[in-house]
Swiss-Prot record:
The lineage of its organism: Archaea, Methanobacteriati, Methanobacteriota, Stenosarchaea group, Halobacteria. It comes from the Archaea. This is HGPRTase-like protein. Belongs to the purine/pyrimidine phosphoribosyltransferase family. Archaeal HPRT subfamily. GO terms for molecular function: transferase activity. It is an enzyme of class 2 (transferase).
């Protein structure tokens, strides 16, 4: 069994406002992220993502940063982090992100019309984050080459499914009876 699958099966589950949330080093930074797990994930992303002609990797703060940094280092593709803080820089584009458990204003810098981007995130659950990011990137005029999330939590409404965008995932899971259940160990293509 691969490390990602095993680590998800061992992940503790918490309930937050009626939402069953798994606590995992990729999505939460706790427990500690082992280098071998991160390496496995990065290799899987590089194999699954369409990287040809990608100018920039775009990821939301905070939990996409460690994954995207590692992919950037392995591919030499520059990294853009979508921040929750406004800087007021020229070309800064705001977006509103709503998930199953939070709402945030976020800001994109350093993505221009005509840029070819890979959107990369840790978890696809409600689709609120990725849908908002893809819409904002489209408004900027960027070409979204591919969208990849490491983990997809199935079993609920997913905004991305009703949008023109789709995401590849490395593994699909659900939470049943207080435990993570592997739905598809290969994720979505």
């Amino acid at each position: 069994m691969d490390q990602l699958q095993q680590s998800l099966l061992e992940a503790p589950i918490i309930e937050k406002d009626g939402y069953h949330y798994f606590v995992h080093p990729i999505s939460d930074g706790v427990p500690m992220l082992e280098p071998n797990l991160l390496r496995e994930i990065v290799i899987k992303i590089i194999r699954k993502a369409q990287l040809e002609n990608v100018d920039k990797i775009v990821t939301p703060a905070a939990m996409g940063i460690h994954i995207s940094t590692a992919v950037s280092l392995m591919t030499d593709i520059p990294l853009v982090v979508i921040r929750k803080r406004e800087y007021g820089l020229d070309g800064e584009t705001p977006l509103f992100q709503q998930t199953g458990y939070s709402e945030n204003q976020m800001y994109i810098n350093d993505v221009d019309e005509g840029d070819s981007v890979l959107v990369l995130d840790d978890v696809l659950s409600t689709g609120g984050t990725l849908s908002a990011i893809c819409s904002a990137l489209e408004d900027i005029g960027a070409d979204i080459v591919d969208v990849v999330a490491v983990i997809k939590k199935v079993g609920g409404e997913n905004e991305l499914e009703s949008s023109p965008y789709s995401a590849k995932t490395l593994i699909n899971v659900d939470v049943e009876d207080g435990e993570v259940v592997i739905i598809d160990s290969n994720g979505d293509n």
